């Protein structure tokens, strides 16, 4: 059995690019609304359930993410971004915008399977980082499995630097 490690990525807020919304009309990226709660959770949970790099931890991980998800949706301003295609939620990123937390990207950018490899994950990551940076965080952190698609293809973007990280499942904030 191969042990799978964790990586913690760090981005400097002052080095982030500016926001850009280069979308076709039928796509949008914005904060989630309360009526999108069910679709948003479906995108996040299926992203973890369908990716084999999470198999050994998903039964402990999803309840923790769900707890933070429910907490976020109980507030007036929801700390979750969604990507929509028409009225369908195709991507979501649950964040914790407090300045001094060990992990800001609770779910990381989660994209529905059929919409992957189109740049939505990178765009969702960038907008998540910018949203956290607006809350006075100088360094922004995101944790993921070392074998995840996020670690290989998404998180190195926008100046993300990785380091090995010891993940206790009580510390939640991961990346798909």
Language-model segment annotations:
Residues 1-25, 168-170:
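Acyl-donor-binding surface of acyltransferase catalytic domains
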Residues 28-42:
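A short beta-loop-alpha structural element at the N-terminal edge
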Residues 80-82, 88-97, 103-105, 110:
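Conserved beta-strand in the GNAT
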Residues 111, 117-130, 134, 153-157:
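Conserved acetyl-CoA-binding loop-helix of GNAT-fold acetyltransferases
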